[in-house]
Structures are given as C-alpha cells and as structure tokens.
UniProtKB/Swiss-Prot annotation:
Protein name according to UniProt: Phosphate acyltransferase
Keyword Lipoprotein: no
GO CC field: cytoplasm
Transmembrane parts of this sequence: none
Species of origin: Thermosipho africanus (strain TCF52B)
Enzyme Commission numbers on file: 2.3.1.274
Keyword NAD: no
Catalytic activity: a fatty acyl-[ACP] + phosphate = an acyl phosphate + holo-[ACP]
Protein's gene: plsX
Family the UniProt entry places it in: Belongs to the PlsX family.
Length: 327
C-alpha cells in the first residue's frame, strides 16, 4: 500500500481546507494510507476513514518562516512529515507551506539523491498545445551551469512521467542566439548541447514558454519564478478583462453565453489548482509542494500528484538518469 504524509498546518487555508481535501482523497483512494500530520485540535470531532493515520505534534510553521528556522523546529508538522519520509514510514510528503521551508526540509531531512547538487522545483506550465515543465521555478536563486544541467535531467524525467516522449529542452534566456546571456547561460548552453544533442533546441525567450516550442524549460529559480508569476498574472488579467467587457452591453452578454463552454475550458486549462502541486525533484522520496493558497480541490489534486510520483518511482528514475549521464 502506498503511504503519503500530508502537513495539515501548511498553507493559507490550513487546517480546514487541507483536512477536507485529504479526507476526500482518502475516501476515493483506499489503496493509499494517508498520514495526517497535525496538532491535536485539528482532529476534534473528525471521523477519520480507516486508511488514515493520525500523527499528532505540537508545533507548526508560519508561512513567513525562514528556511534555517524550519530545519530547527523538529516538532513542526512539516518537519515531522519529512521525517516520516526519511525513516521510510511514508513514500511521499505533501505540504502547502512555505516553499523555502519545504525545500530545506526536503533537502536536509528527507535527504538529497546522491550526486544531486540542488533539488529543483519543477512546475507544469500550460501551453497552446499541452504543457511544458519549468525547472527551476523558484527554489534555487543562485546556480551554476552544472546545476542547470541537473535541472534539465530532472525536468526531462518529470515530463516523461506526465506523458512526454523524448522531451525537447530549451534554456531560458534573453535571446535565441547561442552567444546570448551571462557567462552562466553561455556555459550552460554548451553543456546542454553536448549532453542532449538534438534533444536540446537551444535558447528560448519568455514569450516562447506558452508557445509549446519545447517540453522542458531550464532556468535558475530567480528568472524561472519571475516568468511563472508573470504568466499567472497575465492569465488573471485576461480573465478579469473578459469579465469586464462582457458586462458592458446586452450583445456582449449574449455572446458570452454562447462562448461559455469555451471560457470554461480556457479557465480549466489556466487554473493552477488543476495540477494541485508540483515536485521537489532530486530528494530521496516524493515531495510535493502544493500552492500556498490551495483549497480542498487543489489539495486533493496535490495528493494525486504525489500518488503518481510514487507509482512511477520518480526518485529511482532520477537516479537512473544521473547514472546514464555519468557514462
């Protein structure tokens, strides 16, 4: 039976929405044993399904916690969840808590895969065709070219898990020419070209991310996070503009009614809650970061992501890819 720990106190809407999403998932996935890691009051008047295990501690991390503090507070719900993974009592961890704190706990408590310098936060980004994987999306601000190579290796394995065959790779840069960017990007370009051959398409710009030109976009966490947040902001603005325009007159309103299925499909494609969570890849276990503002639906989907990561043996595939790269 697959075993997943969930941090009930991580996220803007903890614990109510986290617990509701977890219980809903447990009821629909009886082949998964869910470890609910929370404080005693989280479980008051709650009837747990038979495949849920209550894990009680007495501390939790605020959303503005520093990563260094996160690894010192060993009784926090996030730390205890990761400790369960370290001790092999669970196969995966899910948390909607602070990103930096979860990265620190994943790295130093769960532990890095041997050979991985920096675990990466890899995020599916919607494109006009389907999606691409962005690695890194904010976990690693200052990186070396060798880190970008490992992000590419891990991003490729994640893209394969999501159904991409022989994923193509692009390096996020300020232009498509080979000589663009800082020395870091120039060196990374040559390393990626040597390692992946034709699988590496070359440099891609920010406006290429949603165009579906590549399956994996490699970036440092600083620029990757800016690109991701810019896309999220643009999608939100477009949605709000459409809502505003259709209310201006009766003709627009009638047209909107006819276009309702199209708008619904578009909203679903752009909704980050659809993916629920994404992986910290490169650690000895499956660790899923759910969005900080996750509701019960997003938590349900984050647990689905974790289950798939366990079923597909993602950490093992990362190890195999690293060995192949070293040959």
């Amino acid at each position: 039976m697959k075993k997943i720990a969930i941090d009930l106190m991580g996220g803007d809407y903890a614990p109510e929405e986290i617990l509701a999403g977890a219980l809903s998932f447990a009821k629909e996935n009886e082949d998964v044993e869910l470890y609910l890691v929370g404080i005693e009051e989280n479980f008051k008047d709650v009837q747990l399904p038979k495949n849920c295990v209550k894990v009680v501690t007495d501390d939790f991390l605020p959303m503005d916690v520093k990563p260094t503090e996160a690894v010192r507070r060993r009784k926090s719900t996030m730390y205890v969840s990761c400790q369960l993974a370290r001790e092999k009592k669970v196969d995966a961890v899910v948390s909607a808590g602070n990103t930096g704190a979860l990265l620190a706990c994943a790295t130093f408590v769960v532990g890095r895969i041997k050979g991985i310098e920096r675990p990466t936060l890899a995020v599916p980004i919607p494109t006009k065709n389907d999606f691409c994987v962005l690695a890194d999306a904010g976990a690693n601000i200052d990186v070396k070219p060798s880190n970008l190579l490992q992000f590419a290796i891990m991003g490729v394995e994640y893209a394969k898990l999501l159904g991409k065959d022989n994923p193509t790779i692009g390096l996020l840069n300020v232009g498509t020419e080979e000589n663009k960017g800082t020395q870091k990007e120039k060196e990374a370009f040559q390393i990626l070209k040597e390692r992946f051959g034709n699988q590496f398409v070359g440099n891609v710009e920010g406006n290429d991310l949603n165009a579906g030109k590549v399956d994996v976009v490699v970036a440092d966490g600083f620029h990757g996070n800016i690109a991701m947040k810019t896309m999220e902001g643009a999608a939100k603005m477009i949605t709000e503009l459409i809502k505003s325009e259709v209310k201006k007159n009766i003709i627009s309103a009638l047209g909107a009614l006819l276009m309702k299925p199209v708008f619904s499909s578009l909203k679903n494609k752009l909704d980050p809650k659809k993916y629920g969570g994404t992986f910290f890849i490169g650690v000895e276990g499956v660790v899923v970061k759910a969005h900080g503002n996750s509701n019960r639906t997003a938590i349900f989907n984050a647990l689905k992501v974790a289950k798939k990561g366990v079923e597909e043996k993602l950490p093992l595939k990362i190890k195999e890819a690293l060995l192949k790269c070293a040959e």
